[in-house]
Design a protein with these regions (language model features):
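Chalcogenol-based redox active-site neighborhoods
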Residues: 1-211
Length: 211
């Protein structure tokens, strides 16, 4: 059964490159990014894991923990990490799950029904501190994930979780936001002291509230 936005992220206990981890316990009160790759020693995923390791500080300042998953065994992960560190000039600094029994892949619907049952699709799940799924993305094998976009989405999710706003197309942190349609004009004046710019009754902008 496919997971939907707002569903509780399935918990699991997994063997990882950083030891055995209970996923929900490991997350604690943090946000989480869980992303899968189809197999170790694949070229696109090699660049992706390297990219994530280089921006770990960006995830940390947003209170986000990152974990990767594939169905390959732990020894394979460890050998692949050496290649990633060498070719991407990085040091892998987050856990990679060895999901040999496909427990995680099945729980998160990462096995494409028309694909080899060994391969996971390249999915991304963003999970809130409440353990609810906030976003899902699935990429084709030929297209590397854009982690700048994933950080941008996290910024939007965290902002809109604490303020009655939405973020418009191509929004980036610090830019104007949209006042939620459920907020009346009088309430908006109280909630957003930086001011309101009303374009249409349903389209009202306000400077980004402070997090």
């Amino acid at each position: 059964m496919s997971l939907r936005l707002g569903d509780t992220a399935p918990n699991f206990t997994g063997i990882t490159t950083e030891g055995t981890i209970d996923f929900h316990q490991w997350l604690g009160n943090s946000w989480g990014v869980l992303f899968s790759h189809p197999a170790d020693y694949t070229p696109v995923c090699t660049t992706e894991l390297g990219a994530v390791s280089k921006i770990k500080a960006e995830f940390q300042k947003r209170n986000v923990k990152v974990m990767a998953v594939s169905v390959d065994p732990l020894d394979s992960h460890r050998g692949w990490i050496k290649d990633i560190n060498e070719t991407q000039a990085c040091a892998i600094n987050f856990p990679i799950i060895a999901d040999e029994n496909r427990q995680v892949a099945s729980a998160y619907d990462m096995i494409h029904p028309n694909a080899d049952d060994k391969a996971t699709v390249r999915s991304v799940f963003i999970i809130g501190p409440d353990k609810k799924i906030k976003l899902t993305l699935t990429y084709p094998a030929s297209t590397g994930r854009n982690f700048a976009e994933i950080l941008r989405v996290i910024d939007s999710l965290q902002l809109t979780a604490s303020h009655k706003v939405a973020t418009p197309a191509d929004w980036r942190g610090g830019e104007d936001c949209i006042v939620s349609p459920a907020v009346s004009d009088s309430e908006a004046q109280k909630l957003f002291p930086k001011g309101i710019r009303k374009v249409k009754p349903y389209l009202r902008y306000t400077p980004q509230p402070n997090l």
